[in-house]
Each structure stands twice: as structure tokens, then as C-alpha cells.
Amino acid sequence: MPEPAKSAPAPKKGSKKAVTKAQKKDGKKRKRSCKESYSIYVYKVLKQVHPDTGISSKAMGIMNSFVNDIFERIAGEASRLAHYNKRSTITSREIQTAVRLLLPGELAKHAVSEGTKAVTKYTSSK
């Protein structure tokens, strides 16, 4: 009986030959997809508040995570409010109510006033 054909030995774990760069058929490197984050906006606000202060990449990651978390909470609460009131659109009113429900006391007041200011600025620029 003939023996089964043996395949070529697998490359060793530390082998450098196994590592190849991702390339398209025409030989050009593939562009990495951008990971969306709020880092440029966090940095702009930091420079407005403390112009001479920097931020580490670890701290920026934490800030990005924080902004994503707050965004999801507000969006979820606004969605629930729209659903309760049998509305299919989330308006600035739902966002404002969601902010009042989620943020404590003085922080909610400041957030609402800043949000109102931003919406006014946007509508006047149209």
C-alpha cells in the first residue's frame, strides 16, 4: 500500500518568511482603515481650557471611551423617550430630556445650556 503524501513542513513560529505585507494585485499597499475617534476634538477642547497642557495616548483612549459611553447612554435614553411618546424621530427635545435624566444637577444645567447654544449657532449659520 502506498504511503500518504507528506506535505511541506509548517513554518516555525519565529520564522520571518511567514510574515508578508498585505498587498493588492497591482502591487500597491492597502490603505489602513481609519479607526474613528474623538481624539482631535478632545485635543481641541484641552487646548482651549489649558493651552500649555498635553495628553498621553492612554489618557486619550480613556477620554475616547468616556465620550463613546456618554453618547450611547444619551442616544439610548433619547430613543426610549421617543418610543414612549410614539415618535419615530429623535429631536433636540428628546436629547435635552435624556441629558437632564442622565446627568446630575449642575452638570445637566451646563450641558443643556451648551447644547442650546450649539443648536442656535447651527441654525443661524444655515
Curated annotation (Swiss-Prot):
Modified residues (N6,N6-dimethyllysine): 58
Positions carrying Phosphoserine: 15, 37
Modification sites for N-acetylproline: 2
Region Disordered, residue ranges: 1-32
Name of the protein described by the UniProt record: Histone H2B type 2-E
Gene: H2BC21
Origin superkingdom: Eukaryota
Modified residues (ADP-ribosylserine): 7
Known glycosylation sites: 113
Positions of post-translational PolyADP-ribosyl glutamic acid modification: 36
Positions where N6-(beta-hydroxybutyryl)lysine occurs in the chain: 6, 12, 21, 35, 117
Modification sites for N6-methyllysine: 47, 109
UniProt cross-references to InterPro entries, sorted A to Z: Histone-fold (IPR009072), Histone_H2A/H2B/H3 (IPR007125), Histone_H2B (IPR000558), HISTONE_H2B_site (IPR055333)
PANTHER family: HISTONE H2B
Known partners and oligomeric status: The nucleosome is a histone octamer containing two molecules each of H2A, H2B, H3 and H4 assembled in one H3-H4 heterotetramer and two H2A-H2B heterodimers. The octamer wraps approximately 147 bp of DNA.
N6-lactoyllysine: residues bearing it: 6, 12, 16-17, 21, 24, 44, 86, 109, 117, 121
Residues bearing the modification Dimethylated arginine: 80
Modified residues (N6-crotonyllysine): 6, 12-13, 16-17, 21, 24, 35
Positions of modified residues (N6,N6,N6-trimethyllysine): 86
Placement of covalent cross-link Glycyl lysine isopeptide (Lys-Gly) (interchain with G-Cter in SUMO2): 6, 21
SMART domains: H2B (SM00427)
Role noted for this protein: Core component of nucleosome. Nucleosomes wrap and compact DNA into chromatin, limiting DNA accessibility to the cellular machineries which require DNA as a template. Histones thereby play a central role in transcription regulation, DNA repair, DNA replication and chromosomal stability. DNA accessibility is regulated via a complex set of post-translational modifications of histones, also called histone code, and nucleosome remodeling. Has broad antibacterial activity. May contribute to the formation of the functional antimicrobial barrier of the colonic epithelium, and to the bactericidal activity of amniotic fluid.
Modified residues (Phosphothreonine): 116
Organism: Pongo abelii (Sumatran orangutan)
Post-translational modification N6-methylated lysine, affected residues: 117
Modified residues (N6-glutaryllysine): 17, 35, 44, 47, 109, 117, 121
